[in-house]
Amino acid sequence: MNNEDISDKKLTLQGLSKLKLDLNLNSSASPSTGATVVKKRRKKSHDAEEHNLFDESKLCSLTEKEQIFRINAVQNAALLKERNQREEKEKTAKEDSNKEIDEKNEADALSKEINKQVLSNTHLVEPKEDSIDHEDNDKKSFKVNKDIYSKHSKLVIAQAIDEKTEQPPVFKQRFGIRGRKSKFTKGKNISREVIIPDKITIRELSIRMAEDSKSVLKMFKEEVGESYRVDDLVDPDIACEIVEKFNHTAKRVSDTNREKDLFFIEGRESLPKKPKPPIVTFMGHVDHGKTSLLDAFRESNVAERESGGITQHIGAYQITTKDKQKITFIDTPGHEAFTAMRARGANITNIVVIVVAADDGIMKQTVEAINHAKAANVSIIVAINKIDKSEPGDVEKIINSLPQYDLIPEGLGGDVMIMPVSAKKKTNLDKLEEAILLIAELMKLEAIEDCRALGWVIESKIDKAKGISATLIVEEGTLKVGDILVVGTTYSKVRSMVNHLGQREKAALPSAPIEITGLNGVPNAGDKFVVVNSEKQAREIVEYRLELIKKKKEDLGDNNLDIFSRNNSETEELSVVLKCDVTGSIEAISSSIDKLGKDQVKLNILHKAVGGITDSDVLLAEASSAVILAFNVKVDSKIRDLAKQKGIEIHTYNIIYELIDDMRMYLTKMLKPVTREVRVGFASVRQIFNVSKAGNIIGCYVSDGVIRKDSLIKVMRGGKLVHEGKLKALRRFKDDIKEVGVNFECGVSLEGNVDIKVGDILEAYQLVQEERVL
């Protein structure tokens, strides 16, 4: 029967059969109680009543009024029956709900009882005399935190109580309080890799090991035998030993190797190398056609003609030849910029093209350009330009004059290629391209592409629209958009890359010039860039470089460098730039100072010329770590300021013998000193004490001289050397002392595992360095 009310609806005879069917179904589905016989009897009588009520033969014999009365009676009976069934269902549902509530209350009561028993067993509650106050608190706590334990926890507690276990489970979490680990709880022993630089304090060492500074100080006291403070600098080798005592791994990192490690490519030998385009720079005298040659090559660029792009001035560009080979050109304003970049260590260029005008010949700046290129140790091609304006014999004259500048042409048995060209008429440009590619092939220029990118900065600028941008040339690897790179004392994320055609690029391969944006600072031309893994690493590198610059400024004062301190012991070479008033002075001084150089040291004249000192001379001296010698030449104040800024020394002379004596003195300073041993004392071993923590303590008697703490020790046994090393500790009684004199006893400890026997002789000595003279 449908739930909708049908009392207000008109009941027709046509719906009688449906009503009868619904009543039959409801009667058959209605529940009944009692015995089976009673059920059958009642069912039969009920069916008989309904059959009588809906007997159509009887209904037909009744009048219409009686039929309607009969139907209404049946309808009312059906509605009454439906209401009774609905009320019975609601009553049953209510009873079930009350039953669930009772069960839940019983469960909560049981849970409270269980919790009280567990807390009393695990001593998480106060003693019995305070139980009344805490009981109220517990009730409040349970009221707020009804579900403090999970179902699994309750099950475990119940099982523990049922089984009457002697040690019920203890839960770390207390009521309403998140479990916290005690700060006094010792964690797991974690082995760390600890970086040990050249200078490190105990405080910094403790932080890197994540150990208590008191424990580290105690370990130093036990191992070294001396008392330290947390801010004391310690020897890096001793620091490595202390790190290993704490079961960590020490990694020794020298500040001198840190920059080398930054540009180190792991697995370089196994990575595949591919040919890379040569990088070419045009140098020469003003108005000899360097820019015209560059423009001629640019106009002949196959890639530019095909793309129809507009060339962007980004300091460098790349052309594609007819043979689909690429050449990268650096567009510098002159050899001064070339040398300025080289002064920063940027040996970017592979090939230098010296441009000489056929109608002018070799000029002053041409000679400077030649000397700069030779100092950079790069391949040189001489391009004789403007042959369309030259007279017969001009080219041959230039070729024959090159040997006096140490450039031997191929026609004279040398290796310098000479190429007559015309930028205006575009004559022999293809041959100059072939010469460049031939030299590049002989040089076997290769680079790894599948690694992090590193390269050089060509130029940088600030644009109102783009912000700070820089032109880079990739030396190795592949530079991508999104890379984090470190350049100079700044780091940045590459936001965009544009080539010289103004086209956006997603990646740049080796020798490719590219303009990037998104820099945080303005880098200098010649700065080297490298891609790092994260901003954290980039920040650490920049902080290290800034600290290094700060230390150098403190050590060097007002940038007043001693040129000879910058010549390291490996090179043992003094480079000079010589400027004189006349050519006769140049020849006399050159021959005299050349004789001073011997096998131990070498004097190299980078550039010699008549005239005053120029900006180019200062830049060349900076790039080559050279000193400038000026004989009978005045030095302009601007040049002195520039030299002071660059850290270059200028020495002026009027007497040739003073110049030669100074050169002899400077070369003497460059000689390596002689190191010899000086014995300071002897001691005999009388007793050996085995101390577990500090190792063996050797009881000695000083028979001659003095034993100092900084002395080196030789252990002699029967006239033979048994051991040689450093003193680890020197004590008299329980005091640490610096030295022990003759006829006194002392206790010493040696570094390393030394086999010492009673009767051995300890020979103390020191190393003394003595200067040599030419």
Swiss-Prot record:
GO terms for cellular component: cytoplasm. CDD domains: IF2_eIF5B, IF2_mtIF2_II, mtIF2_IVc. Residues 309-313 are annotated as: G2. It is found in: Cytoplasm. Transmembrane segments: none annotated. Belongs to the TRAFAC class translation factor GTPase superfamily. Classic translation factor GTPase family. IF-2 subfamily. PANTHER family: TR-TYPE G DOMAIN-CONTAINING PROTEIN, TRANSLATION INITIATION FACTOR IF-2-RELATED. This is Translation initiation factor IF-2. It comes from Wolbachia pipientis wMel. The lineage of its organism: Bacteria, Pseudomonadati, Pseudomonadota, Alphaproteobacteria, Rickettsiales.
